[in-house]
């Protein structure tokens, strides 16, 4: 009986000592730990969401529709709003095609205020013919929705699919060129 009790006490003692060894010592007031003071904690980036949402890291994206309208007016550039859903296969395909096309990326970087939205906006001008995705709407610096710049579908005027990148680029160029002739 005494041997069993001694064994239990020994196991508990070893367990307590093991925990004490593995614990980090507490800092005393007035002392500094040079390692933790100099090295910031690592930043976890896995799963981090950015404003580009995969549409182009080198493009400057605005966060909200209101911010986009203000910047369009302030910078005298058209606002291009991409409405999409992250789990929609058509949105994913358009995103991949848009990212892969150098001209689309260049125009977006240099000539547009860019916004991509995964939720509807209160402005009904953003959905004149429905709330489908993906759809791309152009707004000029006078804050007018460009209803003349649309995709090739009659029933979903602002829809584009992955094969429509040339049409989208044409509309981007038109949106940009109208600035020179209209304003």
Swiss-Prot record:
Pfam families (UniProt xref): Thioredoxin_7
Protein name per Swiss-Prot or TrEMBL: Anterior gradient protein 1
Role description: Does not appear to be required for cement gland formation.
Similarity comment: Belongs to the AGR family.
Cross-referenced InterPro entries: AGR/TXD, Thioredoxin-like_sf
Transmembrane segments: none
Domain of life (superkingdom): Eukaryota
Gene: ag1
Tissues expressing the protein: From stage 18 (neurula) onward, expressed in the cement gland until it degenerates. More weakly expressed in the adjacent hatching gland.
Cellular compartments annotated: Secreted
UniProt entry tagged with the keyword S-adenosyl-L-methionine: no
Main localization category: secreted
Signal peptide residues on this chain, from the entry's feature table: 1-18
């Amino acid at each position: 009986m005494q041997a069993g009790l001694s064994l239990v006490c020994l196991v508990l003692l070893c367990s307590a000592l093991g925990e004490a060894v593995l614990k980090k010592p507490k800092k005393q007031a007035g002392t500094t730990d040079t390692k933790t003071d100099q090295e910031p904690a690592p930043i976890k980036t896995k799963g981090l969401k950015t404003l580009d949402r995969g549409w182009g890291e080198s493009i400057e994206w605005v966060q909200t529709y209101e911010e986009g309208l203000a910047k369009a007016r302030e910078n005298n550039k058209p606002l291009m709003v991409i409405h999409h859903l992250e789990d929609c296969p058509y949105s994913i395909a358009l995103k991949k095609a848009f990212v892969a096309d150098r001209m689309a990326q260049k125009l977006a970087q240099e000539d547009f205020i860019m916004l991509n939205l995964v939720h509807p906006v209160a402005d009904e001008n953003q959905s004149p013919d429905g709330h489908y995705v993906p759809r791309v709407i152009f707004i000029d610096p006078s804050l007018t929705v460009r209803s003349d710049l649309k995709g090739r579908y009659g029933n979903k005027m602002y829809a584009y699919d992955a094969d429509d990148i040339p049409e989208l680029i044409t509309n981007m160029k038109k949106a940009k060129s109208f600035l020179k002739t209209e304003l």
